[in-house]
Amino acid sequence: RYHRAAAGQLLGGVARLPYDGYLGSSVDTADYLDHLLSDPSSGVDAPAAVIVETVQGEGGLNVAGTEWLQKVAAIARKHRALLIVDDIQVGVGRTDSFFSFEAAGLRPDIVTMAKSISGYGLPMALVLIDRQLDRWEPGEHNGTFRGNCHAFVTARAALEQFWRTDSLVASVRAKGNLLKSRLEQIAQKYDPSRASTKGRGMMRGIDLKSGEVAGQVISKAFKRGLIVETSGPKDEVVKCLPPLVIGE
């Protein structure tokens, strides 16, 4: 029965709105969101939830400002919508703190997590839900990354090993600054209008403004034994996400 019902909501029921800074520094897209939801003639229905990444992973390493995130959270509450933070790529220390939204002081109703949460690269995904919102029956939510017993063991081991103290956070912060500095040195060798750094923590990259150029960079890197991805709407950002425990 649950399999046939799927998620209960079609993808067409999602409205996508511009991220922080997308329309330039003079336009606050959080205010735009509030205006759309406050105006019955906007064409945007009242949402069940607002979903946001604090740093856009596949979107091109765009970093949302703290004030913008706080405003979006307040707007969600104002319009009686849940706040969902997608921490799949940016959580578990990738941006230094365990949850990427800690610095902004957010309290999401739902948090999605995966990838690094297993600790050792095993398939695992979690959905953290406020107990008052949990209405799922046993077995109702399933998928290929759910219920992997091996991953549960490694995830617990990783949490106990790396998150008992704040040492990993301090290490990620220091190495993130080092990574930023090195990438800035690379970008400065070229025309600033053609190369600039982006990201936060150990989730950094260089925006080359061209998917073709970025593709050439990762191709040459691969030939030299280094696997690097691209992201952004035109694959124009060379994306560097090294292991959190990598040496300096």
Specify the residue positions occupied by each region the protein language model found.
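Conserved N-terminal phosphate-binding loop of PLP-dependent enzymes in the Aspartate aminotransferase
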Residues: 1-248
